[in-house]
Structure formats: C-alpha cells, structure tokens
Amino acid sequence: MPEVADTCSLASPASVCRTQHLHLRCSVDFARRALTGTAALTVQSQEDNLRSLTLDTKDLTIEKVVINGQEVKYTLGESQGYKGSPMEISLPIALSKNQEVVIEISFETSPKSSALQWLTPEQTSGKQHPYLFSQCQAIHCRAILPCQDTPSVKLTYTAEVSVPKELVALMSAIRDGEAPDPEDPSRKIYRFNQRVPIPCYLIALVVGALESRQIGPRTLVWSEKEQVEKSAYEFSETESMLKIAEDLGGPYVWGQYDLLVLPPSFPYGGMENPCLTFVTPTLLAGDKSLSNVIAHEISHSWTGNLVTNKTWDHFWLNEGHTVYLERHICGRLFGEKFRHFHALGGWGELQNTIKTFGESHPFTKLVVDLKDVDPDVAYSSIPYEKGFALLFYLEQLLGGPEVFLGFLKAYVEKFSYQSVTTDDWKSFLYAHFKDKVDLLNQVDWNAWLYAPGLPPVKPNYDVTLTNACIALSQRWVTAKEEDLNSFSIEDLKDLSSHQLNEFLAQVLQKAPLPLGHIKRMQEVYNFNAINNSEIRFRWLRLCIQSKWEEAIPLALKMATEQGRMKFTRPLFKDLAAFDKSHDQAVRTYQEHKACMHPVTAMLVGKDLKVD
C-alpha cells in the first residue's frame, strides 16, 4: 500500500521508522496536575542508514533521552499550534533497515495538556477525591508522551502507573496487577498490558475513586460508586451486543470488554479505548434507550481498532463502518424496522449538519483534506452519517444486508492490524464484488467521496416507525392557534422514547415555532420533566430557537452540567444567537471554561467567537 502523508503529524512517517512497543512508567501528581515518567519506545527503522528520527510532542517538558544507557542529543522544534512541537532525536549509531532501538525519554506533561482533564473533588460525584481522565483521539497522545502520533503506526504497550493508594488507575489494556509503590507508601502502582498493536490515539488512562460491577463474562462496568448500580442496569445488554458483533465481524481479539462511565465533562458520547470503552453519563436514561452508543463502541473493536484509518482524512472508514455495524446490532436485537428507523434518523442528522456548515463547505466531504486543519475543528457527524449512507446505499445496490455483511467481515479479516485509506477500501470492494463491477461502476464515486454537500443518491428507508413521528410533527408545524386545543398527552401514548426523540428532531428542523405552540407543547407533554438527555437536548433547542425566555436557565444548566460536545456546543450556539440570552451565554462560558474539558472549552470559545 503506497505511502500517504499524515499532515496532522510532525513525526517521522511510517516509511522511515515504526514504533513497535511502548513501555510507560509514570506517576500521577494531582497537586501539580502533571504526569511524570519515562516512555521507552521500541522503534524499528524502515530504511538503511537511519541517523535521526522525529517524534510528536505537545506542551511536554523533556528531561533527557537515553539510548543504550547513554544520554543522546535531541532538539525540540518551535510549537506549531495544535500540532505541537517536533522532537528530533539523534541516534548514536546509524540503524540499518529493520534494526530496532529502544529510546527512553524522561518527560513531564503540562497542567494545560490538551489530552487530560484534571477534576477537583468538587467536580466528582463522591466529592472526596480528585479524578483524571485522558482523551487522545485524534491527535492529543503527543500531549501525554512523545510518540509517532499518527494512526498509520501501531504498537503494543505495557505500563506501570503510580497513583495515590486510595484511587484506582485503569488503562486501555488488560489489568496486570497492583502493588504498593516501593518509593512511597502512600501510593500504589497499577500495571497494564496491551498485547494487540494499536494506534496511539487509543492509549487511555483514568484515575479516580472507581468501583466496578460485573455485568457479563468479559465485562465489568466501572464508575464512581454513586453511578455503579445505575450503570450496571443501563448497560446490561452489553454481552448480547458483543455476541452479535462477533457474529458480524469475527472473533473479539481484545480479551476484556469493560465499560467506564466518566464524570459529566467527558466530551464525547463514547470513546472506543480497547478493553475499556469510555462513555458519557448522559447515556444513563434509566431505560436502556441510549444503548446504541454501546453498540457503536463495541463495533469499533473491529472497524477502527483492528482496521484503522491511515490518516484522519479517511476518518469515515472508522466511523461509517462502525455506525453500519452498530445499526445491524440494534437491528438484530430490536428488528429490521428499528434499523431502518435509526438509519433514516441518521439521514436527517446528515441534512442538519450540512445545513449548519453550508452545502459547499469542505468539511461536508466524506474524504477531507486536513492539511493545516485541526481534526477537532473539522469533527462532525459527516464521517458517521455520510459514511453510513454510502454503505447503506451499497448494501441496497449489491444485494441486501447479508451480502454486504459478507463484504464487511471479509474487509475486517483482510485488513486487521493494518491502517487503510479510502483507495484501499474501494479496491477491496471491487475485488470482493468482482462479479458486480457493472453495478459498482454505476456509483458516482467522485460525488460520494470527494464532493461537498448531500450525497448524490438517497438510499431507500422503511418508514414504518418514522411515520408516527412525522405525522405528529406535521400537526404541530401546521397548527393554527385555534388548533392548539386538539393536542393532548394521548398523542404520545404509542410512541417509544426513540420516536419521541425523532418527533422533536422533526419539529426542530422546522424551528422556530410560534411561542404559543411551544408553551402549549410544554403544557400538554411536560417535556421539561424528561431527563432523557437526547430528548431534553432537542426540546431545549426548540425552546431557545423559538425564543422562549423561560427556557434560558434550563438550557444554560444543561450546557454546563454536562460537557458532551454534541449537546453543549449547539446549546451554547443557540443561546448566543438569541438576543435575550447572548450576553448570559458568553458570561456563563467564561465563568465555566476553567473547569471545562480543554477541547470543549476551545471549541465553545470558537463557536461563541470569544478568546
């Protein structure tokens, strides 16, 4: 497979050298908000006469670099903003092709590391102990340790992490024991081993007052004790989802599949860290209705973690295939009509995102060009939903779900433990369906892959479960003031929480509604009392876009009490666009930003045009 440049990394590319293994020894210092330690990187030269190599770093302090017991020279280049600073290391002897060297780097992270959020005890559920978690995707691993911070390089890792003894450390690896810290009796060392090679964006660490409960033969759910029972209930379907995923993708190679429920500031719905999926507590709806996120993270164990996008330009390969698998898992559990219902909801989400960006915006392309673009800034639902739409369209073109799932399983088998580009994927698609090349040649590949805006074709969707949502939303959107008395709580009696959410998504596409309509909707449906995060989010957006002043404190509360960017960013944007709440939104952001996740704080700041 030809070399493609990773414009998001300043390190030597995989064609020059490859990190094969990391041994991390570090200590977590809550008082100084720093990780201090050594990263021993086993690097294999990919060419003859290699005399130096470059690693990614970001806001790191480097103490020294040691090779074969000798300190060696290194230079830290100028900072290049979100990309960090290249670190060039001189090798004491030139390496020949395939020769390995162990480079031991002593480093310390910055309190402002973009990869880490340090929480005070007050920011936790238990209020007694501090908490730390990492989020490396896409390019923040370099803000924890020097590395080739590119998904084109995969490595195994082992780690020893020293933490205060009343706390627990977990990583994206198999737990490998714990022992008192010989250097400090008030601390404990936790050991970890990840034997499957992974891109370094999947390295993850959490430290806190964590407890666990077993919910399946290979699954513990971890959280602070205040959430552990609720989480065990919410995610009880995990093992049945894993079994379906293995049926669709092949054997689960990672051993353990644990779940970690994080504090509310965690910026994503979930993060597929191997052996330990991280999830937002906003999934704790009480009725398992948001468990599709678990199906999504489980699916990444194949698409993303085994078969990985070679650069972030091809992120859709990770996310499109993962959404495709996720919806098949939910289809197996809840029926094919349910799969189509979520697929169609995803098309609506795609329309919304394209409308927000503008239909000619380069970030609405499936394959993006991230040269001089921070992947966090480009991040959106496009790679998920445009990617899914392409695969769903191909499923229908090529003979249905069973046929296309056969392709997906073969794709995973072919490219496991590798990193791939869109061209690799497309070549394999053509090879797998060599008897259907005529059909494949009907696809407008250029439009699907490289053009902005909506895809050239909309797939076919079963609308059975969506129809009720559309019908009720139409009634509201077309209602005159004198019609408002015709609505009652009976309207909702046959709708699932998924359908209620879709109803609000449909109405939101037509926002603003007259204020009288919104007040009447609250009067008959009492949406303010609903705690399901997805439903509450769409309801509050509808209220603010329709200029209901009474909703301002509720929207501000939701935007700040949790930090999942899917919710926080649009809520802040809507509040800033409403004259009655603009100043309050900016003020609230400025008051809260010091205790927000660093990436969330940066992006909300951009959204609000402050800083």
Swiss-Prot record:
Record-linked Gene3D superfamilies: 3.30.2010.30, Neutral Protease Domain 2, Peptidase M1, leukotriene A4 hydrolase/aminopeptidase C-terminal domain, tricorn interacting facor f3 domain
Active site per database record: 297, 384
Top-level lineage group: Eukaryota
PROSITE patterns xref list: ZINC_PROTEASE
One GO process term, biological-process aspect: leukotriene metabolic process
Positions bound to a peptide: 135-137, 267-272, 564-566
Residue numbers carrying N6-acetyllysine: 73, 337, 414, 573
Note on cofactor: Binds 1 zinc ion per subunit.
Record-linked InterPro entries: Aminopeptidase_N-like_N, Aminopeptidase_N-like_N_sf, ARM-type_fold, LTA4H, LTA4H_cat, M1_LTA-4_hydro/amino_C_sf, M1_LTA4H, Peptidase_M1
One example GO MF annotation: aminopeptidase activity
Transmembrane segments: none
Residues annotated to bind Zn(2+): 296, 300, 319
Protein name: Leukotriene A-4 hydrolase
Gene: Lta4h
